[in-house]
């Protein structure tokens, strides 16, 4: 049998990781190209009869992915939902492939630099977006994503990883990497604010709490700092100078149930619960919620509860898109009872990461795990 030089598929895999990482914030095509190189490297890896050892977390994820496909077949969406689930499952492949080709710290540092560069490019493109709008900063930032919410959530997650890296570079005096991480972190925060994504803001705050908690050895000092920041934050938000700040007003609007956006979100959540109850155990199927959401709004006279004509039209548009405005309610409606082990998967990963951080010495891996924990918490809180 033809023998493959291990160095060849390792280099192909590394190239795939680099392209994938650089493309995260800027190009879906780039992500797919990077994934293509990773798949090729993985096939060569198998050809070379290399053993694959999955971690407990990877086994859990793999089982869930298989069950997602099975549930999609038997869901109300049938073959259509199965096809959509199959198309979207490729997003999880890097979880299994990337660790195979991160062979040393040099590769990790290149990956992190490319991650930061991806944020730079995304931010610059976002500035060009505002230039087209004649610098109308009331508009929500869109860079390479098709929707500001997508932009907001990935920025919230990315900024938390960068924060952990910043602390690492300062603690270990890695001043060569400090400028790129610091600039990327600042730009990510600015862009995050400009997206006006309230859920992403909450996600960032939740992830920030976890990151700071894990990085501060003195937990009493952490509690004092949280209380102090909370008091100062409330004082700043309620001060006269910031009472008309559009970003603060947007954040405060989360609790306003009469706000049109919030009302639509609640109606979509109600419809998802209705879908779950009426389509047990398999759900309505992947990307198949729009028909049921529209039926729910019509049957329960939800359009009549909207005050303005444009609000009724907007509700119909959102319902028709099948966007249920929450990973939890979307999973509940589309995947049925599988939603519970699916969400449990993320909580299990968090638990394993937390245990790792408690027992681990504070090296680069520790800070990377803390950063990815922050990312996962931001994802789960932002929902």
Question: What is the role of each PLM region?
Answer:
Residues 1-83, 101-113, 165-179, 220-225, ...:
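Transmembrane signal-anchor hairpin modules in multi-pass inner-membrane enzymes, especially those
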Residues 16-20, 107-137, 146-217, 226-242, ...:
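Alpha-helical transmembrane segments of multi-pass inner-membrane proteins
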Residues 20-28, 326, 330-335, 366-383:
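Membrane helix-loop boundary segments at the extracytoplasmic
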Residues 28-48, 85-96, 150-159, 202-209, ...:
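Membrane-embedded alpha-helical segments of multi-pass membrane proteins
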Residues 58-66, 78-101, 110-114, 119, ...:
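Aromatic-anchored transmembrane helix interface
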Residues 194, 215-262, 270-278, 286, ...:
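A membrane-periplasm/extracellular boundary helix in multi-pass inner-membrane enzymes
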Residues 257-270, 282-335:
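Long extracytoplasmic/lumenal interhelical loops at the membrane interface
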Residues 334-357:
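Selective detector of the "anchor" transmembrane alpha-helix that sits immediately C-terminal
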């Amino acid at each position: 049998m033809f023998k493959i030089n291990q160095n060849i598929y390792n280099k192909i895999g590394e190239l795939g990781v680099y392209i994938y990482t650089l493309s995260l914030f800027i190009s879906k095509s780039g992500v797919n190209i990077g994934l293509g190189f990773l798949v090729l490297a993985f096939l060569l890896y198998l050809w070379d009869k290399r053993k694959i050892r999955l971690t407990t977390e990877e086994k859990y994820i793999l089982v869930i992915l298989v069950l997602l496909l099975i549930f999609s077949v038997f869901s109300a969406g049938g073959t259509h939902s199965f096809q959509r689930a199959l198309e979207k499952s490729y997003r999880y492949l890097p979880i299994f492939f990337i660790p195979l080709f991160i062979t040393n710290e040099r590769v990790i540092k290149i990956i992190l630099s490319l991650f930061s560069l991806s944020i730079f490019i995304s931010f610059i493109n976002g500035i060009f977006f505002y230039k087209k709008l004649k610098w109308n900063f009331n508009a929500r930032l869109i860079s390479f994503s098709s929707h500001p919410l997508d932009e907001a959530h990935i920025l919230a997650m990315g900024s938390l990883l960068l924060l952990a890296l910043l602390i690492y570079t300062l603690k270990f005096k890695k001043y060569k990497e400090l400028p790129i991480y610091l600039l990327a972190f600042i730009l990510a925060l600015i862009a995050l604010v400009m997206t006006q994504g309230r859920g992403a803001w909450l996600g960032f705050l939740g992830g920030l709490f976890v990151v700071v908690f894990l990085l501060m050895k003195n937990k009493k000092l952490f509690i004092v700092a949280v209380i102090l920041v909370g008091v100062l934050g409330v004082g700043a938000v309620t001060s006269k100078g910031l009472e008309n700040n559009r970003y603060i007003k947007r954040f405060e609007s989360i609790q306003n149930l009469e706000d049109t956006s919030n009302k639509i979100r609640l109606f979509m959540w109600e419809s998802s619960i209705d879908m779950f109850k009426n389509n047990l155990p398999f759900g309505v199927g992947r990307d198949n919620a729009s028909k049921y959401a529209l039926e729910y709004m019509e049957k329960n006279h939800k359009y009549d509860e909207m005050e303005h004509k444009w609000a009724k039209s907007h509700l119909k548009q959102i319902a028709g898109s099948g966007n249920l405005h929450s990973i939890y309610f979307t999973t509940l409606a589309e995947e049925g009872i599988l939603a519970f082990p699916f969400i449990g998967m993320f909580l299990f990963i968090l638990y394993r990461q937390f245990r790792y951080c408690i027992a681990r010495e504070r090296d680069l891996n520790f800070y990377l795990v803390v950063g990815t924990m922050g990312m996962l918490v931001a994802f789960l809180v932002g929902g």
